[in-house]
Amino acid sequence: MHIVYNRYIHKGAPLMNTALFQQEMKNIEEYAQTLCDTLEENFKQDSIASYKRMAMTDSGYATQRLEEIENGTANLYKFVVQKGRKYLKIINQQYDDMGAYATYQYRDGSVHAFIDRETGDVYKPASWNKPAKHVRYNLLERSDRNFLFDWKNVGWAGGYLYMR
């Protein structure tokens, strides 16, 4: 009796058809953008709290920055999604307005996280090009999404991505 070994190995999740797979990938991309929006809100709220503490010492700079944030004219950090072959890369962008060579536009700062395009797994970055080994969260799990999409739970600096 001849048995094809690979045919009977359990490979985890059952195979899904192409339409369902493409819909899941689209959902993951939307979730990644929502995570970026949440990180931007976290940075905004963190900046407001920081400048309010500074303003207590009668700092004109802090008061000016608070007004810019309230008016929507402040150049706060942005988080953008860059699509790769296997991963979505969430990149922190900073406004370049310092020094003699200032470009006065947003430039890439650092990688905040990697998201697997097929599974929705969220990884801490190991470098600019690759994620760390262990999965931190999964965007397809409702409980993880509820946690990640609350600006009070995530940190713009990535502290929530350390092993828990």
Regions found by a protein language model. Give the residues of each.
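Negatively charged, low-complexity tracts enriched in Asp/Glu with abundant Ser/Thr
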Residues: 12-80
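Feature targets compositionally biased, intrinsically disordered low-complexity regions
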Residues: 11, 83, 98, 108, ...
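A short, surface-exposed interaction/processing loop segment used at functional sites
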Residues: 119-149
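Exposed beta-strand-loop-beta-strand "reactive/processing" segments of non-cytosolic proteins
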Residues: 68-113
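C-terminal partner/receptor-binding element of secreted or periplasmic proteins
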Residues: 144-164
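Short, Lys/Arg-enriched N-terminal segments with co-localized hydrophobic residues
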Residues: 2-16
